[in-house]
Design a protein with these regions (language model features):
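Short hydrophobic targeting helices and cationic amphipathic motifs
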Residues: 5-7, 21
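Conserved beta-strand hairpin/beta-sheet module of binuclear metal-dependent hydrolase folds
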Residues: 26-74, 110-112, 175-177, 225-236, ...
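Divalent metal-coordination and catalytic microenvironments
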Residues: 31, 62, 71, 88, ...
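Metal-dependent catalytic neighborhoods of phosphoester/phosphodiester hydrolases
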Residues: 96-103, 302-310
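Metal-dependent phosphodiesterase/nuclease catalytic metal-binding core
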Residues: 146-294, 303-314, 330-336
Length: 336
């Protein structure tokens, strides 16, 4: 048996009487910004696209023009990308798909690629795929959905993805990526101390006590520590200001919300079904989210600091999106 710390049977260190907890880093849950501009191209920003990395599985959210270049610049691996989520069928959110799919074909990809979108994307994209990619090395599978209500559209062992009905000039939705609760963490030193057999570990992780060969009951609380709280990431772009989203966004760890305009341009925001920075911040404040990331900036602003100042005056834990930015979901943004 391997060596372990000098603990008594209550899990305390005999030397200094301090409780010992097995150290376990939180699983990876990070957001990469590939683009944060809006419809009009600029030299400062790429169109909207993001990648969420959950335990080294990559989920792309929107795919504007040039997304595959930014994907490489962010040092992400194409082989780990199997799912793409499209919010709506405006070009600045999906024009990058054809190029990305073609590149994956040139690379000899064999794994299926799943694309989730409002109804209509397959009808638009499939003819171009048929024309430009006669010999596809892999399958592209479309999963289309209606945007009027909240739907569970994806689930695996780690996360669920639920739609957020938004209001734009065409059918549009956001997404909530939610971690599933994880079993308790094993305190390895206590497992060694009581010489717990390996076959008992799954039961213990799921809440069972351990009974020693002598009949002593070792409480689960001595053998485990609680797992980290599940984290949630919410993506809202493009949409006008929707105060009723507070209930669905309540307490999320990170909210990305479009902030195309400042409050002074609110009439233009209303006309184009977009949101101001102040409105995005008000939604974040009312929903009591941990942190707010704003993006989808209008090309009219050469300096987005005006958007940041406006948002922070309402919700201080706000940050501007920026190409190649990587954010840990669960961290709190503080003003510099």
């Amino acid at each position: 048996m391997r060596k372990f710390l000098n603990l008594d049977k209550k899990g305390a260190c005999r030397k200094n009487k301090c409780p010992f907890f097995y150290c376990n880093r939180m699983e990876k849950f990070e957001l990469h910004i590939l683009g944060c501009g809006s419809a009009l191209p600029t030299t400062r920003h790429f169109p909207t696209s993001q990648v969420l990395n959950v335990r080294d599985k990559l989920y792309m959210i929107d795919c504007g023009e040039g997304a595959q270049l930014q994907f490489r610049k962010s040092r992400l691996k194409f082989s780990r990308l199997n799912h793409i989520f499209i919010s709506h069928l405006h070009g600045d959110h999906c024009f990058g798909l054809l190029g990305l799919i073609s590149t994956l074909n040139l690379l000899g990809r064999t794994a299926e690629l799943h694309i989730y979108s409002p109804v209509g994307l397959e009808q638009l994209l499939q003819p171009m795929l048929d024309f430009f990619n006669h010999q596809m090395t892999y399958k592209v599978i479309f999963h289309e959905f209606e945007t009027k209500g909240s739907l569970l559209i994806y689930e695996d062992r780690s996360i669920t993805v639920t739609t957020i009905p938004l209001r734009h000039r065409m059918p549009c939705c956001g997404f909530i990526f939610a971690e599933k609760p994880r079993p308790s963490h094993i305190v390895r030193e206590m497992i060694d101390f009581y010489q717990v057999p390996l076959y008992e570990l799954n039961r213990i992780k799921n809440g069972a006590d351990y009974v020693t060969p002598d009949g002593e009951v070792i409480p689960n609380s001595r053998l485990t520590r609680p797992s980290d709280l599940p984290r949630r990431y919410a993506y809202c772009s493009d949409t006008c200001y929707l105060p009723h989203l507070v209930s669905q966004l309540k307490g999320v760890d990170l909210l990305f919300h479009e902030a195309t305009f400042v409050n002074a341009d609110a009439p233009r925001a209303k006309e184009t079904f977009h949101t101001t920075a102040g409105q995005a911040a008000q939604l974040a404040r009312d929903a009591e989210v941990k942190s707010l990331l704003i993006g989808h900036f209008s090309a009219r602003y050469e300096d987005e600091s005006c958007l940041l100042e406006e948002a922070r005056s309402v919700f201080p834990h706000t940050r501007l999106a920026q190409e190649t930015l990587c954010v840990q979901v669960g961290e709190t943004f503080f003003q510099a």
